[in-house]
Amino acid sequence: MNPAGTVPTLVHGKRVLTESTPMCEYIDAVFDGPKLMPADPAARYRVREWCRRTDMAAAALSVLGWHSFLGPMLKQKSEEELDRLIARIPLKERRIAWSAAAKSTFTEEQLDDARAKVGAWAAEMNRQLARTPYLAGETYTLADLVAFANFWGLPRTVPEYANAERTPHYLSWLRHMHARPASIRLFQASRSLGQMALGLGAELQEAA
């Protein structure tokens, strides 16, 4: 259903939505509940700017995710199963990425570059969170939700960059985000990654 061969995909009535961040804004606008997009145009711009920057930063994180999580999972499949799975992906660059993850063809230079880029983004979030309690200002918005969805695990993924000494404000925000009831319900409903997230959340609370 998604021409890019990625997830998520949302079907709502006759609409098919395939871009995750615009999808979040659509859900916020269409469904009932506390609104995550501010009414003020300037404030709304700041939220969208942070969402866009988060999406761009997530590209480096995906390399680490493919290497650490997707690769080991795909290695459990036979070569024939893997070839069939990859052949179903419509975009060539996504097929190449999945193949690289499955065969562990990321070089140490590529992995180090990805870690450095993710670490730079952690530092950028930390600088903003030193000024305001949330990424786009004084209130919780879609910017925080999108950033947390992508970067909830940096103390585990890049501990050399995301730690109490280098990014204390990011860790304080992360602790708050992990403790939100919606986050806990989501992770409890998830499988292995959910359990990992719950464990990290508990560690953050203990370290507070």
Q: What are these model-predicted stretches?
A:
Residues M1-L91, T105, L204, A208:
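GST-like domain detector, emphasizing the conserved glutathione-binding G-site
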Residues A58-R175:
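GST-like fold's C-terminal all-alpha helical module
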Residues P159, A164-A208:
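Long, positively charged, glycine-interspersed low-complexity recognition regions
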Residues V47, D144-L145, R180:
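Short, thiol/selenol-centered motifs that function as redox-active sites or metal-ligating centers
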Residues D28, A147, G194-M196:
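Short secondary-structure boundary/hinge segments and terminal tails
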